[in-house]
């Protein structure tokens, strides 16, 4: 039996739980939610072979609901003996005005979580280089990525772990489809260009709604993102609205879309680099009529 098929409760530590979970709601609803998120996180880690025992993971913590949820779920799995890696929580303070600098250090220290807070004023760089009418996402992302790679190397980490969830992956897929002219989403596992760091997204199967409910129940001290979240008209917002509308009219379509991303048939697409159409010819062997119907 695959270890990921067993009941979460079978792996609880003898001391009960990680300190982060000692005051959680004792309700059936929360227990189901927690177990579902743990199961989906474990499944993604297993499906995409993220774990190498003894590795050190740098868990990126922004102060938003998704990164809090990611950190909590990984700590929960580690506490239960299901994640044999070291965890380091890292926050990159990018210098946004009115950013509450005390919240994350206080939270991490309170629960005894190993962490590093790094200050780099990328906010000023972005706002100086771009006009107010521009969207900051691309430049901000490049600056953030460079700093995170540097910190991971300084801390001896083998992987950078991000809190992107199911909806992030689907939104990226449709952004690439509608605006980039390519079929691509966010990979759950990626090797950086230099070849020395992995990037993992263990929440690839987790629903954003579940992560929001989880964050509310856990009472995480959420920090809003004023730098990018306040800008209107972003392509991602349009994709998010489209997916919400589709799910409202046809419940369950998001799960179907995620399954589709795991079930690609290159022979039924038009990319000649992925499938040898030139070498496909009648030779008496059976083919497939699926694409005709």
Curated annotation (Swiss-Prot):
Q: Which GO terms describe its molecular function?
A: 4 iron, 4 sulfur cluster binding; ATP binding; magnesium ion binding; sulfurtransferase activity; tRNA binding
Q: Which Pfam family is one of those matched by this entry?
A: ATP_bind_3
Which Gene3D superfamilies does the record cross-reference, listed alphabetically?
Answer: HUPs
The pathway to which it is assigned is: tRNA modification
**What's its catalytic activity?**
cytidine(32) in tRNA + S-sulfanyl-L-cysteinyl-[cysteine desulfurase] + AH2 + ATP = 2-thiocytidine(32) in tRNA + L-cysteinyl-[cysteine desulfurase] + A + AMP + diphosphate + H(+)
SUPFAM superfamilies attached to this UniProt entry: Adenine nucleotide alpha hydrolases-like
Q: What is its main location?
A: cytoplasm
Q: Per its database record, what is this protein's job?
A: Catalyzes the ATP-dependent 2-thiolation of cytidine in position 32 of tRNA, to form 2-thiocytidine (s(2)C32). The sulfur atoms are provided by the cysteine/cysteine desulfurase (IscS) system.
What NCBIfam families does the database record attribute to this sequence? PRK10696.1
Give the protein name, as stated in the record: tRNA-cytidine(32) 2-sulfurtransferase
């Amino acid at each position: 039996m695959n270890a990921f098929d067993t009941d979460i409760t079978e792996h609880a530590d003898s001391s009960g739980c990680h300190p982060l979970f000692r005051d959680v709601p004792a309700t059936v609803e929360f227990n189901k939610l927690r177990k579902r998120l743990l199961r989906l996180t474990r499944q993604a880690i297993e499906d995409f072979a993220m774990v190498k025992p003894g590795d050190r993971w740098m868990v990126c913590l922004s102060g938003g609901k998704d990164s809090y949820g990611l950190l909590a779920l990984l700590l929960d799995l580690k506490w239960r003996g299901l994640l044999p890696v070291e965890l380091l929580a890292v926050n990159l303070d990018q210098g946004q005005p009115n950013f509450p600098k005390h919240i994350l250090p206080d939270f991490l220290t309170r629960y005894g979580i190993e962490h590093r807070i790094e200050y780099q004023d990328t906010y000023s760089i972005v706002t100086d280089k771009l006009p107010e009418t521009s969207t900051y996402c691309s430049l901000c992302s490049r600056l953030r990525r460079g700093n995170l790679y540097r910190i991971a190397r300084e801390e001896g980490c083998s992987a950078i772990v991000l809190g992107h969830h199911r909806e992030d992956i689907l939104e990226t897929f449709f952004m690439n489809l509608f605006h980039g002219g390519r079929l691509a989403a966010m990979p759950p596992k990626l090797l950086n260009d230099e070849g020395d760091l992995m990037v993992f997204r263990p929440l690839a199967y987790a629903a954003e709604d579940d992560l929001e409910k989880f964050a509310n129940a856990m009472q995480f001290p959420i920090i809003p993102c004023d730098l990018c979240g306040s800008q209107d008209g972003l392509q991602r917002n349009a994709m998010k609205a489209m997916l919400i509308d589709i799910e409202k009219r046809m419940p369950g379509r998001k799960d179907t879309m995620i399954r589709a991303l795991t079930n690609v048939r290159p022979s039924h697409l038009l990319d000649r680099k992925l499938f040898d159409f030139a070498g496909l010819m009648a030779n008496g062997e059976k083919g497939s009529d699926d694409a005709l119907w």
